[in-house]
């Protein structure tokens, strides 16, 4: 039987092992963890804007918003610590054909915080919160564009890849400006300065034009990969939901930008007097086309999930954000078209996203405590 000193040695060894595991977790941390922010943030946004509200729902959204901010800064601190201690890991991450694609999750997760500031804080705190969100949005837009332009070029010049090894994760760095453009539409709608709003939406249209067509190109390549090489490995099968992300968020973004254009263009005498109405109508029309295109990709994803078992990993957060932004387009169409059908669909999708968030968040916490996600 161990003596008192023996027990002390055992405890010290256990403490050292725990510290070693913590450092291993930090060392193995990668940008994909910011998908937790994406999923948590979009769930808060959906609950805050649910077409059919009930008492207390707003407070649930506020709790998720606060939780999302805490998680974001926690992950940001870990990331800074990781790259400060091991600078070579940053270069290794950029050179990694999979981890570099996950860089897009950082600005997209940040965008959900900006949107929540508009939806939750501005009605309470007033115009200064809108201006604060506007400043944050410029940071998010800059990072999103940098990632969208840089990472695909790395894919062309540095990464070793093939059609067979491709997954829908190729979309992640490209979707970041789509999310930023949609977020810009939300922020611009809250700005009282029409000139600032005009500048914002014009930048958003350019970002949308940079990213959405390129995302369509990736979708064509991805469909070819599926047709020639069949479904992706089961470990990455949840990524089958990613294609509905740019379609849903792109559609929502165009509608939201159109709403702001219809208000701001006539006030500033920008283009023709009818220009704002044209932007609004064309945005709604293109959004419907994109939403319909998203439906068939949603079907492909759901059908893929039935083809066999797949086990939990951090990629399961793709159950939340892509469907979540598709839902924002759905609820926005319900609002703009005054359609009960889209309101009901948006509510249904929102409930599904919230349920998926509860499941994936619980599994993430459990697997993090057991250190399984850091191995």
UniProtKB/Swiss-Prot annotation:
Glycosylation sites: 193
InterPro entries: SLAC1/Mae1/Ssu1/TehA (IPR004695), Sulfite_efflux_TDT (IPR051629), Voltage-dep_anion_channel_sf (IPR038665)
Extracellular side: 47-59, 123-135, 189-200, 256-277, 331-343
Annotated coiled-coil segments of the chain: none
Cell compartment(s), UniProt: Cell membrane
All ranges on the Cytoplasmic side of the membrane: 1-25, 81-101, 157-167, 222-234, 299-309, 365-375
Residues passing through the membrane, by range: 26-46, 60-80, 102-122, 136-156, 168-188, 201-221, 235-255, 278-298, 310-330, 344-364
Keyword Transmembrane: yes
Any one cellular-component term (Gene Ontology): plasma membrane
Family matches, as Pfam families: SLAC1
Molecular functions (GO terms): sulfite transmembrane transporter activity
Protein family membership: Belongs to the tellurite-resistance/dicarboxylate transporter (TDT) family.
Function: Sulphite efflux pump required for the secretion of sulphite as a reducing agent. In the presence of sulphite, cystine in keratin is directly cleaved to cysteine and S-sulphocysteine, and thereby, reduced proteins become accessible to hydrolysis by a variety of secreted endo- and exoproteases. Excretion of sulphite mediated by an efflux pump also represents a detoxification pathway for dermatophytes during infection of the epidermal stratum corneum, hair and nails, which are rich in cysteine.
Protein name stated in the entry: Sulfite efflux pump SSU1
Lineage: Eukaryota, Fungi, Dikarya, Ascomycota, Pezizomycotina
This protein's encoding gene: SSU1
């Amino acid at each position: 039987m161990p003596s008192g000193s023996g027990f002390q040695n055992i405890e010290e060894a256990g403490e050292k092992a725990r510290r070693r595991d913590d450092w291993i977790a930090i060392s193995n941390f990668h940008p994909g963890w910011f998908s937790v922010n994406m999923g948590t943030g979009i769930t808060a946004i959906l609950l805050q804007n649910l077409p059919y509200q009930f008492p207390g729902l707003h407070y649930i959204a506020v709790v998720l918003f606060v939780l999302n901010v805490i998680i974001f800064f926690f992950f940001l601190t870990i990331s800074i610590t990781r790259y400060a201690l091991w600078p070579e890991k940053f270069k290794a991450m950029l050179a990694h054909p999979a981890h570099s694609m996950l860089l897009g999750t950082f600005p997209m997760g940040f965008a959900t915080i900006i949107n929540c500031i508009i939806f939750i804080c501005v009605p309470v705190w007033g115009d200064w919160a809108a201006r604060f969100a506007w400043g944050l949005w410029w940071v998010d837009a800059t990072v999103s564009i940098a990632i969208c332009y840089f990472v695909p070029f790395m894919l062309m010049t540095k990464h070793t890849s093939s059609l067979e090894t491709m997954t829908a994760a190729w979309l992640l760095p490209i979707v970041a400006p789509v999310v930023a453009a949609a977020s810009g539409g939300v922020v611009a709608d809250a700005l009282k300065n029409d000139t600032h709003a005009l500048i914002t939406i014009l930048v958003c249209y350019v970002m949308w034009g940079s990213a959405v067509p390129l995302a369509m190109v990736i979708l064509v390549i991805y469909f070819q990969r599926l047709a020639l090489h069949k479904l992706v490995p089961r470990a990455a099968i949840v990524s089958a939901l990613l294609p509905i992300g740019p379609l849903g968020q792109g559609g929502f973004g165009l509608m939201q930008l159109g709403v702001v254009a219809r208000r701001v263009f006539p006030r500033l005498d920008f283009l023709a007097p009818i220009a704002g109405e044209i932007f609004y109508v064309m945005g709604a029309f293109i959004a419907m086309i994109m939403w319909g295109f998203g439906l068939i990709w949603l079907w492909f994803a759901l059908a893929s999930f039935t083809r066999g078992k797949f086990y939990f990993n951090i990629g399961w957060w793709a159950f939340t954000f892509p469907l979540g932004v598709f839902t924002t387009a759905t609820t926005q169409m319900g609002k703009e078209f005054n359609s009960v059908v889209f309101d009901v669909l948006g509510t249904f999708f929102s409930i599904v996203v919230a349920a998926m968030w509860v499941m994936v968040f619980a599994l993430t916490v459990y697997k993090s405590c057991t250190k399984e996600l850091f191995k």
